[in-house]
Every structure is written in structure tokens, then in C-alpha cells.
Amino acid sequence: MPRGFLVKRSKKSTPVSYRIRGGEDGDRALLLLPGCGGARASPPAPGPGPVPGPLQPPPPTERAHAALAAALACAPGPPPPPPGLRAAHFGNPEAAHPAPLYSPTRPVSREHEKHKYFERSFNLGSPVSAESFPTPAALLVGGGGGGGGGGANGAGGGGTCSGDPLLFAPAELKMGTAFSAAAEAARGPGPGPPLPPAAALRPPGKRPSPPASAAAAAEPPAKVAKAPGSKKPKAIRKLHFEDEVTTSPVLGLKIKEGPVEAPRGRAGGAARPLGEFICQLCKEEYADPFALAQHKCSRIVRVEYRCPECAKVFSCPANLASHRRWHKPRPAPAAARACEPETPARAEAREATGGGGSDRDTPSPGGVSESGSEDGLYECHHCAKKFRRQAYLRKHLLAHHQALQAKGAPPPAPPAEDLLALYPGPDEKVPQEAAGDGEAAGVLGLSASAECHLCPVCGETFPSKGAQERHLRLLHAAQVFPCKYCPATFYSSPGLTRHINKCHPSENRQVILLQVPVRPAC
């Protein structure tokens, strides 16, 4: 906090008077200045040679008598008081205690001094520029009038008896401070003009800003505690992008980590041509871009996600999770409506929502939709009728089945080649109707009596899985779509397409990059 900050501003400061005691030890001889005809007893002025030490000011009593004699000799006035009486000087503290010559606030001329006097007299109420109770040390502050008391000029050094610069000098210009010492060192011993102080350059109505150290000391500790580093740092999440870069969950591919090898130079030290095609993973070189696009990199491997219940393979873990939801036990419905035959409308709705009965996988974008087969037609093996949609064919087959059941005639047998394709050979596993159903029901957590098996073609319900498969082999042999890459069979073309896209993508897909003919722009 700057000095003088807590000074009461209600009281207006008035010029301070100082009383100077006379000679207590006896009568002292008055010293007259040479300009007034008296003898000079002050120490000699410093010469051009080096000064051995700082000037020692005379005792206070001698300085008081010397200043009094100088004032009386230069200005006409009443006769001086006798030496026995105490001389009182009102408003002239500098006349009694002259300041040293190195004060930076010394005026240059009397006009400047008068102007400065009237200008500074309006600032008597400023708590910064004035002090309420000056100490004896403050009386030695360099002022404009005291500089000429013991100077080399015969007319009093060009100073005045004004105590303005003494009373209203800023605090940093006092004796013993670092600022005054620095100003004295900068001014030098020469008689050149003094450096202007900081207070003279400041507008009269402004209060000086405190230094940085004072501002830091005046700042409350709460603000210091709330530094910029006081905020809690947010938790930095460590994100690992390695899996996102090296794996493809849609295609089921992953890039293996290869050995770190230094780049090998070519034999002969020749530089590599610009037209060379090199795989960035396995570093194999190819002569043309087509061979580079068609090659199978050894670092790209297929990631398979196999279902533990039914051994189905998926390329994406999300598809496997969606598939495994079908293996969870369902709430068993009431026993009365458990094996109740479904109507054709309900069968259509179930087929539309769930897809094929034996293939409930997530449909792939590359599969063929159920709106039509690859040829766009579905043919009935009973009457050779053709339908554009599989749902229409199922309705038609259901009508055939109901008509045959009403007549009591046995259903027609499927062709011989279809029977050979349907029945497994001796090396293949034959599904057991009774034991297999029990094991499957035990694995899935379902009871055989509580679940009905629906025919995916005609919608007929059966109490067991074996009965459903026998029905499919005998009646709907033409509607079975076997996989040409594995012994799996499906009852719909979209189901077979989804199976091939998921389980056999490498055999089905071909590299078409850089092989598509460029079409002219429209």
C-alpha cells in the first residue's frame, strides 16, 4: 500500500511552520555571505579534481544562523532580532535546513520556480504528494530553494525560501532511497541541468501507480491461491486407434504386424524407377498395377467370429452378438395355444419379420432381396405356375397342401435327383430325430412340447424338428437351395445368398479394382 494512502481527506493541509531555536550554548556570530559583504565560512566549492568523500553538512545550529544571515542580507526588511531571542520562520523550513546540491527537483529559473510554486500549491490536499507529519529526515530532502543556500552563486544560489518542494516531494525522492542514489549517479558531478523526476512528469491530479512488489504484497492471499493452475485437470482418456486402423469389422479383415526391417537397396546400387508397384504391407514388387491390385497380401488375414451354440461364422462381432440373441430362451406360451396351427397371414408376417426359418442372420447389403430371385421368377413344382415374389409362391403352395389334405391323397414325391441331393451320404452325419431334438432343446433351453416348428415354405406347424425336416424333404424338395461351397442347405434364395456373403466371401468376391471400363462423361 503506498505511503499516505490512509490520510484523512476531510482536513485541508495548511503550510507548516517550523520554529528554529536560537543558540542555546551562547551567542553565535552571524555568518554573512560574500555577496552581502560579509565573510564566508562555508566550505570551499568542489574543484575539478576528485572529491575524496561526500560533503558533510554542518551542524543544525550553524546552518540555521547561516541561512538567517543570508536571508537578512539579501532582502531589505526589518532589522534582525537580537541573538538572544528565538527567530521564528513561518513557511520557510528549507531556510533553516538547506538540502544538499544533488536533489533532482531543483528549479532552473525564478519564473519556473514561481510557476511551480503556484502549480504545486493546488495539490496540498493530495495524500501522495504531501506528508502530514514530516520527520527531521524529510527536512533534508532536496528542494528548489535549499539548493542555493550553500552554493557557489553569491546571490543565494538562485533559490527561494519556499518549502514547497520539501513538503510535497514524492516519497521515492527522499535521502537514502535507491531512487535518489540512482538519480545522483545518472546526473553526475557536473553542474548540468537536473533530470526531471517522475513526479514532475505525472499529471497533478493523478495518483501514482504502486510498484509491482507493492501490488503483489497488497493482493489478498485468496487471489494468489487461485492461480491459473488451480483448475482441476480433466481426465485424459487414452484412446487406442490401433484396432480401428488395422481391422475392418465389416469385411472381417485384419492386418498382421510385420517384422521391422531396414529398407533393402537394389543390387547394383541403382535407384528405384518411379513406375514400380510395391505393396506397402508385404513389400512385394509387381510389374503393373493390375497385378498389385489382384495379389493376396500375406499380412491380411481373415478374422472369424464363431457362434459357440451352432458353429456359425461371422465376420463382425456385432452380427455374432445379434445372432446369439436367437439362442436365448424365450418365455414359454400357454400349453393350449403352444402347437396351434398358424394361419397363412400369421405365417407371412413371421416370414416377413424373421426371414427364413433356418437362417436368421443379419441380411447383408450384397444379398438378393426377397422381392424376387435372381431370374425374377418363382415356379411351383405342382402346377408349373410362376410368381414374382416368394410370398405369393408360399401362399400358392399352402393352397395346394390344404387341397391335398382335404382329398386324403398322399402328396406327390419329389424328383429322384432332388432326393439324392437331400439325403446325406454314409460319410455325412444323419440327424437323429428323437435324440437330436432333445439335445438341441437342452442346449437352447427350450422344451419340445412348448415350441412349434413351422415350415418355412408352406407355414405348416410340426411338434418336432425331425417331422419338419421330413416334411421339407418330401414336399418341398424343389424349394431347397444347397450351398455349392459347403453341405449347408437353405429354403430361400436370399438365405443362401446371405450365407455365401458371410461364410464364403473370398470364393464369391472378385477384385474389380482398376478393371471397370471407363465410361465417357454424359
From Swiss-Prot:
A zinc finger (C2H2-type) spans 277-297, 305-327, 378-400, 453-476, 481-504. GO terms for cellular component: nucleus; transcription repressor complex. GO terms for biological process: adrenal chromaffin cell differentiation; negative regulation of cell population proliferation; negative regulation of protein phosphorylation; negative regulation of transcription by RNA polymerase II; neuron differentiation; noradrenergic neuron development; norepinephrine biosynthetic process; pancreatic A cell differentiation. Residues 1-12 have a biased composition (Basic residues). Residues 1-112, 182-235, 325-373 are annotated as: Disordered. The C-terminal region is necessary for NEUROD1 promoter DNA-binding and transcriptional repressor activity. This is Insulinoma-associated protein 1.
